[in-house]
């Protein structure tokens, strides 16, 4: 599972990666500043392709890229 996270973190714009469900799913947090929607989709495809090329595993690995912006203001 660490190898899944390590491969995902190699891509530009990726802030964090977490393997869940015994390595059947990888959730990738993309930087909203570095990756727009199109870049996030490309990162997702590229990570999945890297897994296919570099790893041997039974079944499938689902790759989910999450890109969000949060804004917070306090009214006093």
Describe each PLM feature range:
Residues 8, 14-17:
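Short acidic amphipathic segments
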Residues 1-7, 34:
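A glycine-rich beta-turn/hairpin centered on an aromatic-Pro dipeptide
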Residues 4, 39-59:
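Short, non-transmembrane amphipathic alpha-helical segments
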Residues 21, 30-32, 65-67:
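Flexible glycine-/small-residue-rich
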Residues 8, 28, 63:
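Residue-level signature of catalytic and energy-coupling elements of molecular machines
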Residues 16-20, 55-62:
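Flexible, glycine/charged-enriched surface loops at secondary-structure junctions
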